[in-house]
């Protein structure tokens, strides 16, 4: 009998975490990624990681790499602060809905601030031979005589596998083929995201009250501004000297993720928004904040122009149960959600841990892999789709975007 082989489409956080969990259990796994290299495209900004995420990452990473991850992460004051457009504080936002269900590891706090690009480089280190770049996945074929699945790319097949796992995001071609009934909807919110370098110069002008887990200011007209700082907890740790140069460079800088958000009906149309230069986007945000407190306008003035980009906020719509096969999905390919609760990455990492353990258990027991997939999918339909619904509800209240029950048409803008 041929060796059991797993293919993962997508080398994001969930895909690499799942791959490493399987690899540590001795399972043959290959990851196929559309990008030309691990650092050919900036892989996102700061993300909130809770105990669901840290539990999965602790399972995936060898002890040395776990120490790197912790040293490169931030351990902020865990308050979530709310202000009006005049920078007057309101009640602290309850962060219990953003907590995980894992076991916080090594006395680290429930909430971490993590750079997505740094975490991805950490997961990739030492795993290079299992990740294949330059493969844009277009779908798959079922191979009837072997029961395997053939993974297809723009350049043809990359091989036959016993299990295919889509981890390639909201635009997943695998999910579109596997679950064509699942819709991606536009939540009716437009974002302009940017990094704010946290240097001695910027810290001298930025408000101290923003230095918490997460802060949001909003007016009565559907406009908001968020701020989430990342101060690396131990960037000088000697262990960093044994890491690749790209990873060392990543951890040298602290920054904040700042997002200007506005409801789509109050924003310029998409063609105009997505054609703007970085400085035009900054100017547009400042114009819409013309009456705001100077302390908040300062945040936008400190945006790093090289990182400014417009985004469309989108979500999946949960669907009824389906029968399992040897093709399944994790992360945004299955349950992309509003960013309002900050649990999207954590839900994806929970998927990686949940599915990984079920695959490992099935291989150890000699039980059918489809049973493992079915058990995982039944579970993820509960917690994953609950997260989609909860994030949409909170986003409707906090950001002002549509709830998934009322959201409109599909949108291909932004990721």
Residue ranges and their predicted role:
Residues 88-115, 193-301:
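Conserved FAD/dinucleotide-binding core of flavoprotein oxidoreductases
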Residues 14, 37, 171:
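Conserved Rossmann-like nucleotide-cofactor binding loop
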Residues 36-56:
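Conserved N-terminal glycine-rich FAD pyrophosphate-binding loop of Rossmann-like flavoproteins
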Residues 2-4, 66-71, 79-94, 98, ...:
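C-terminal helical "tail/cap" subdomain of flavin- and related membrane-associated enzymes
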Residues 2-4, 50-197, 279-282, 286:
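Conserved N-terminal helical subregion
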Residues 310-330, 335:
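FAD-binding beta-loop-beta segment adjacent to the flavin cofactor pocket
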Residues 23-43:
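Glycine-rich FAD pyrophosphate-binding loop
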Residues 2-14:
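Beta1/beta-strand and adjacent pyrophosphate-binding region of the FAD-binding site
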